[in-house]
Structure formats: C-alpha cells, structure tokens
Amino acid sequence: MAAGVATWLPFARAAAVGWLPLAQQPLPPAPGVKASRGDEVLVVNVSGRRFETWKNTLDRYPDTLLGSSEKEFFYDADSGEYFFDRDPDMFRHVLNFYRTGRLHCPRQECIQAFDEELAFYGLVPELVGDCCLEEYRDRKKENAQRLAEDEEAEQTGDGPALPAGSSIRQRLWRAFENPHTSTAALVFYYVTGFFIAVSVIANVVETIPCRGPARRPPREQPCGDRFPLAFFCMDTACVLIFTGEYLLRLFAAPSRCRFLRSVMSLIDVVAILPYYIGLLVPKNEDVSGAFVTLRVFRVFRIFKFSRHSQGLRILGYTLKSCASELGFLLFSLTMAIIIFATVMFYAEKGTSKTNFTSIPAAFWYTIVTMTTLGYGDMVPSTIAGKIFGSICSLSGVLVIALPVPVIVSNFSRIYHQNQRADKRRAQQKVRLARIRLAKSGTTNAFLQYKQNGGLEDNGSGEEQALCVRNRSAFEQQHHHLLHCLEKTTCHEFTDELTFSEALGAVSLGGRTSRSTSVSSQPVGPSSLLSSCCPRRAKRRAIRLANSTASVSRGSMQELDTLAGLRRSPGPQSRSSLNAKPHDSLDLNCDSRDFVAAIISIPTPPANTPDESQPSSPGGGGRASSTLRNSRLGTPCLLPETVKISSL
Amino acid sequence: MGAVGNSSSLQTKQREPSKDIAWWYYQYQRDKIEDELEMTMVCHRPEGLEQLEAQTNFTKRELQVLYRGFKNECPSGVVNEETFKQIYAQFFPHGDASTYAHYLFNAFDTTQTGSVKFEDFVTALSILLRGTVHEKLRWTFNLYDINKDGYINKEEMMDIVKAIYDMMGKYTYPVLKEDTPRQHVDVFFQKMDKNKDGIVTLDEFLESCQEDDNIMRSLQLFQNVM
C-alpha cells in the first residue's frame, strides 16, 4: 500500500464507527496498541551532510533500509545519529522518496551510480516515478547496450588465444573471421580481395570494344570476343579461388546449416555458380541466350567486397533496419505515380502523335518527372498536361524527401555505433596493458621488498633499506600476508616473465646450467623452500645434477631489462643472505606431500653477471637451495605452479 | 480562516490592449487557464493550533502529527471527494468502496462545500475517537441520514447497507445473496424503529443503541486509534 495511505489509517478506522449500529455480531477487539512514542526527529548523517526527518516519514516504507531495523546497524550512539558513508547528493533523492512517495531520477548523475544507491537503500528501481521513468529506462538501456558491446568486443575481438587443443576447423574459422590474427589469414584476405577486384574488372573490360586488326571495314568487337581465351583463363582462375574459399569456409564453419543460410555464403554461391552452369551447359544456340543472362550474375561478385569493407556492411544493415521507411517510400511513390500517370494520360489523350499511348507508358514519364530527371523523351503538349506535369514534379520532390532523413539518421546512428565499438576495441588493448602494468606494480612491490631483504627479522633494523622501512602500515601487513601465504604453500611469488620463461624451458626440456648464485639472492624464502624438501631436493640433485639451474639474480636482472623494468638491486647485506636455519626448521609443511613443482630455467651463461659466483653455501641445507628440481613426470605440475619460486 | 487564492488575473489585465485577433484569442485562452488555475491554487490554512486544541479532544502533539500527514497528502489543505474515494479504495481493495466513501464524505463535510478542510477532518475524528457515546451515536445518525432531513427512512438505510456490502466485494463466504442487504435493513428497522412508523428519528436511534450491549461495547473499540 502506498505510504500516504498509512496516514489515513486512523481516519479509516474511526470511520468504521459508522458500521457499529448495523453490526449484527459483536465486533472484534482492537489490536493491542503499543505505547506510541511521540513522533521524533531522526538525524541521518550522510558523509557529513545532516538530514533530519520525522521517524514516521521513514517508517512509511518498512521494507527498505531506512524504514526497517536495518538502520540500527548504522546508528552511532555517541552522536545519536545514523551515519552513512554514501553520496549525500544521491541521498537527497532517496529521502525525498520517503517524503513524497515519488522517486525522481537525477538528470546529471550517472545512472549506474543511482542504481547502486537504490540497491543500497533497499529501493527497487521500479519505484521511479512516472515523470522520470522513461528517461531512466532509456538511459539504463543505453548503458546496458554499451556494456554489452564492450563485452562482445572483448570476446569476439582479437580475443584470447585459442586453447591449445583447438582443432584445425576452429583455427581455420577463426582465421577467416578475424584476418588480423595470423599472417596467413591476412595474406589470404588480401589475395581474395585482389581476385574479386580482378574478376570484376575483367567483367567490365571484356565488354569494351577493341579495335580489331586492320580489316576492311574495321570491325569493332568487344574485347571479350577478341581475346576469349585470356578472359576465360582469368575467369577460371578467379572462380577456382572463390570456390576454394567457399569450400574452406564451409568446412571450417561451426554450424554448417547456419553458414549455408547466411547472406555472405549465398552471395558466394551466386558469384561462382554461373561459371559452372556455363561449363555444364552445352553451347547450343537455344540455351546460349539464357547462358548470356547468367553472366550478368557475375557482377554479384562485387558484393563479396562486403566482407572486406565494413562500410558496405553497415550500409546493408542500415537498409535492412530501415525497411519500413523504404517500404513507405515505395508505397507512396507508387500511389503518386499511378495517380499522375492516369491524369497525364487523360490530359494528353486528345493530342495526336502523342507519346502518352497508355497509362503504363505514362508511368515512365511520371517517374522521370517525379525524380526530377526529366529526360525529355516524353513531354506534355496540352496546357492541362503541362499544369499537371508541373504539379507532378513539385510533389515528387516532397514525397522523396520525406523518408530520406529517417534513413540517413539510421545510417548515421549505426555508423557511429560501429565507430565507437572499433575505437573502444582499440583502446581496450591499451587499457588492459596499463591495468596489467599497474597490477604488476603491486606484485613487484612485494618481490622488491623480498629482495631488499625485508623478510629477515627486524633485529637488524638499521641495515634494512630505507625503502623497506618506509612502507606504510598497510603495505607491511599486506606483505606479511603474502609472506604467510608463501610459507603456507611452500611456493613463492615471482613475476610473469620468469614464470613464462620457466614454462618455456620446461617444455623445451632445455639445456640448463647450474649456477649457484646464491650470494646475490635473499636466501630466506628459497632456503625455506629447499629445506622444506631438503631430502627430496638432495635426492633429485644427485639424480638430475645437470638438469637444474636456478635463476640467478643476474638472469633476473636480465629479464628485468628485457621487460623494460629496471629494478635497482637492493643492497645485498650478507646477513640477509645467510639463511636462518631455524627459520627453515620451523616450517611444518610436509615435504612428502609437497609437490616440489619448481621449474628450472636455463641461465644463459653469457649473461651471468659477476655476482653470481658459485659460493660455498654455509649450511648443508643451502647446497640444495640452489638446486631446483623439476618433476617433469607429474602431470599436475604445470597447472599448479602459477607462482614459481625464483632464486 | 485564511483562504489564500493565487489569482494572477490582476497582472494580465495590465497589458496594452491591441485590436489583434490573435491577441484577443490569446487573452481568452489565458483567462480560461487562469480560471482553472484559480480553482486549483486555492490553498487553505487551518486555524491556529491552540484553537483546534480547544475545539477538539486531541493534544497538540497529536494534532501536529495529524496535520503533517494531512498536509503531506493534500498540500492544498483540502480533501475532495475523489481523494476520499481513492483512500477508501486502497483500504478496501476487494470491493467497491466509492459509495460508502461518498456518504462518509458527506458526513465529514458538515458545511456541504464539496471539500473537507482540516478543521472538519479533525473535528470529526475527535468525535469518533474521543467523543462521548452520545456524540458518536449522533455522528453515526448523521451519516445514515443521507438527505440530512433528520430522519432515517428505509431507502436511506438500504443505500447505506448496500454501500457497506459493496465494500465486501464479490468473493465472500457465505455467498452474498440478493436480498441479504434487505434482510439486514429489516432487522435493523425492527430493532430501531420503536413506533413502527417506518422512519427512525434521532431519539429512537439513541435509545435503541443504548439498549444494545453489543453496540455499547463496540463503541469503546476505537478509543485508542491515534
């Protein structure tokens, strides 16, 4: 029930007194009335702006946040007010809804933000009042459309790489639909485009009259008849290419039926069919007339260009979407033509030697006049005819001019939509790259922190780098959290490049070299790792002595430079490198359960910097700290090792 | 009684009269609109709070709450019959409450002006909720007396009873029969009409009601509605 009705409830109940004398049975007792607290003023503090309202006002809608007991969660006993950390401007509209019963939509705010506020306060968007409802819906629809386009662009665009297990079919189809994905596809795309052009030009050129060899009288033949073989060869070549393309598409299409029904495939078929029909049909005189007609269809090859040109597609789509306007145009034109043709015919009937022999003959005159062409092959000679002729030409302009703006605006809208989609697709890549960069920044912060020896005990506080000490409380806690995670999983965080390179190395089974550049590494976590599975590591070390390596800091640096990130190596304090043995022993992850999914990457020996010297590890545990074992046998290895330890 | 009418007709008459057809036509339209505006813009303000408090049985706080709700719903300060009907329709959605609302409106509108001001509203509520038995019964008699002639006859009673049954709607249990209202009226008249002359006067009404225990008890029901 509307809130306002609550106001009238006492009145309605009071008016029931009028029923009393008529009641044949005793009326039920009234419901127990709680001691009604006097109406009080509530203070709602929204981000500093105080709104005050009667409690009754808020109680009008008990199924919203402010009307129910949910608001008690936001009650601040000290100040005696309800505090919401939300947008105060939006709250104004929400509160007005309680007061007036109508929810108005703010014109200058983002519709999404408004929706979120409504959701927070427990108001359904359907409550938007009639005055603002249409605009609200329009804006919402526009937004949703844009978001959908975005998503679509993301998916269909040059989207994510196909899963490794995709079949030839899928790859082929993708190459056809998005020529930009691979070079071969691009080449194919341009080649077909070229051949379409060649075919169309050949069709045109073969009708040009070439001067025959000097003969008396010099005969003019169309080029097609003069060089029949050349043109036939060109035609064959084109048709072969088109046929091949069509068959390939048919093979690669995920849904053949749908492909067969699509417009583009129909165009393809129409383009190549005349040739084959021409081949099959024997060259006798009766049929050759039809055969010649078939050649007309060759011109449809030009429509194949619509795969190559987006503008053409847009035009086609526009015409399709303006079908009703075009229909109207056609209908009104037909009506006008018939009317005027009839009038002109009867007006010119009396004249001798007139061109207006029949009404259909007058159709031609009417069309030519209405479209303001005015060939002049048919001209009225009577005065009445001239008068009606002029009316005809004046009205023609009007009738044609009416639906045209609609079509134009449709085209413009669709075209701009397309432009926007393209632009967004292009920008999307840049956006994603930037976002990735920002994200990697935070992970790098942790890695940087690790390398700067931040993971050691706070004992040697002064020796810690300034950058380590100057982290905010939030960062400290965050890093501590990441560290805990590392300890829990016995994995370490590393960066993307290291991981992908490691992955590459594993699949390559590549040449690895052992380089024990422990000295330059914060050994803490790695020693943890190693001592986490010391026995295993040792065993493996012995067995796979040659197949392990560790990513030296130098190689890390090299990778950094490769990635364009320049990381200043933190001060290498020896103390930080000495693995605290008790650290490792504290670890309680069972080495047996632990999947030592460590990837080894080849360290290009040439780039091994000076720092990575084979140091004699202090503790026994450290010997194996440099060795990482890759259990190539385990199938579950690769998917799990999202973050790989890196030394 | 502060009746403030927003008539802006004064301002328009100050224009330079020209003899344009267009101008006369424009004026005509303008006046038409203004007449309509005048009717809607009339804003009514009630008497002071103290006076109302003296006249009714409500406290100041109760009057404040009542007025706030009233003003919120009817910013112009008056309720018209349409609003009454709408309100009742919302309370009784099953059936058709418009007839009863019409009678109710007439009962509220003591001055028969076609609109109920806040004073009327509050006065009636005061009687119904805080009044004496006598007052309540008299108010009810006034409600039943549709033509306000001081007597209730069978036709008036029929109308009232039918209106009440209309509020019930179609889906009732047991099923509503055609002559149920008539029977009800007959029972009523049998009880109320002491001298069996076919009409019920105020005294007969008061007497009969005071004899009936049920009615007396029920009258106390709506005491605490506020």
Curated annotation (Swiss-Prot), chain A:
UniProt cross-references to InterPro entries, sorted A to Z:
BTB/POZ_dom, Ion_trans_dom, K_chnl_volt-dep_Kv, K_chnl_volt-dep_Kv4, K_chnl_volt-dep_Kv4.1, K_chnl_volt-dep_Kv4_C, Shal-type_N, SKP1/BTB/POZ_sf
Reactions listed under catalytic activity: K(+)(in) = K(+)(out)
Chain segments carrying region Disordered: 144-164, 510-531, 564-584, 601-634
Q: Which GO BP terms sit in this record?
A: action potential; protein homooligomerization
**Intramembrane runs of residues:** 360-371, 372-379
**Extracellular compartment residues:** 206-230, 285-287, 346-359, 380-386
Q: What is known of its domains?
A: The transmembrane segment S4 functions as a voltage-sensor and is characterized by a series of positively charged amino acids at every third position. Channel opening and closing is effected by a conformation change that affects the position and orientation of the voltage-sensor paddle formed by S3 and S4 within the membrane. A transmembrane electric field that is positive inside would push the positively charged S4 segment outwards, thereby opening the pore, while a field that is negative inside would pull the S4 segment inwards and close the pore.
Q: How does it assemble?
A: Component of heteromultimeric potassium channels. Identified in potassium channel complexes containing KCND1, KCND2, KCND3, KCNIP1, KCNIP2, KCNIP3, KCNIP4, DPP6 and DPP10.
Q: What role does it play?
A: A-type voltage-gated potassium channel that mediates transmembrane potassium transport in excitable membranes in the brain. Mediates A-type current I(SA) in suprachiasmatic nucleus (SCN) neurons. Exhibits a low-threshold A-type current with a hyperpolarized steady-state inactivation midpoint and the recovery process was steeply voltage-dependent, with recovery being markedly faster at more negative potentials. May regulates repetitive firing rates in the suprachiasmatic nucleus (SCN) neurons and circadian rhythms in neuronal excitability and behavior.
Identify its protein family: Belongs to the potassium channel family. D (Shal) (TC 1.A.1.2) subfamily. Kv4.1/KCND1 sub-subfamily.
Q: What is this protein called?
A: A-type voltage-gated potassium channel KCND1
Q: What is the lineage of its organism?
A: Eukaryota, Metazoa, Chordata, Craniata, Vertebrata
Question: Corresponding gene?
Answer: KCND1
